[in-house]
Design a protein with these regions (language model features):
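N-terminal low-complexity or simple alpha-helical regulatory segments
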Residues: 1-123, 128-132, 139-153
Length: 154
């Protein structure tokens, strides 16, 4: 099973890397190109967290987990850029992103991988998980709302 997972994960990483390099090289002057390259990088990190070969180095694993946790926020930024006209990201959204990333990092470093359900676990894992779910759900909602105001006729 480990070999199959490594092969499929390697294929996914290679495709996402091509996507990231494409947007980083050919669309780096546009915000959407940089955001999509960052999103592809976050997805690469998410795939790498599941590969058994990457579980050897604890520091690399922490970096992969942090970048993977950033993916819902980056998806929300991409969706906001694409579907909301002339929208600026409010400061409280940036604060929310920094807060949930900080809580996840703190929880990962202090509680570890085998926590019991305590208040600290709820603050550092459960609440950030709901924030990430909220970012993802709102990104999908913005896409559906953007369909009605799209200029392309069906």
């Amino acid at each position: 099973m480990g070999v199959t997972l490594n092969i499929i994960g390697g294929l996914a990483v290679s495709q996402l890397a091509f996507m990231a390099f494409f947007f980083a090289l050919y669309h780096r002057r546009h915000l959407i190109g940089r955001l999509l390259a960052l999103y592809a990088f976050c997805l690469i990190c998410h795939v790498l967290t599941y590969l058994p070969a990457t579980h050897v180095n604890g520091l690399a694993q922490q970096v992969f987990y942090r970048c993977a946790a950033l993916a819902p926020a980056v998806l929300w930024l991409v969706s906001r850029y694409l579907f909301v006209d002339n929208a600026k990201v409010p400061r409280w959204i940036w604060a929310l992103i920094v807060s949930y990333m900080g809580l996840r990092t703190y929880g990962s470093l202090t509680i570890g991988n085998a926590p019991g359900f305590t208040t600290a676990y709820a603050l550092t894992y459960v609440i950030p998980q709901f924030v990430m779910l909220g970012f993802s759900a709102h990104a999908i909602l913005m896409a559906f709302q953007g369909l009605s105001s799209d200029l392309v006729e069906p």
